[in-house]
């Protein structure tokens, strides 16, 4: 079973204007064993077309529990 465990860190380096073209990118930062499964940290970056900085950078946590 997979669970959204929350966020470690969320930043908004640049404003995203309405109508902007964006894209998301995910990168696995870490994976560690926890009781009954594994916890994975994924860094999600929202890029704005033509922007120098991303609109959002967030480290999300997911837990996968195995039975």
Show the residue positions of the predicted features.
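HotDog/MaoC-like acyl-thioester-processing domains
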Residues: 12, 16-67
């Amino acid at each position: 079973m997979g669970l959204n465990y929350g966020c470690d860190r969320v930043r908004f380096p640049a404003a995203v204007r309405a109508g902007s073209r964006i894209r998301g990118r995910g990168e696995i930062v870490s994976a560690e064993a926890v009781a009954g499964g594994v916890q994975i940290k994924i860094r999600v970056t929202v890029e704005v077309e033509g922007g120098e900085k991303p609109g959002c950078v967030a480290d999300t946590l997911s837990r996968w529990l195995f039975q």
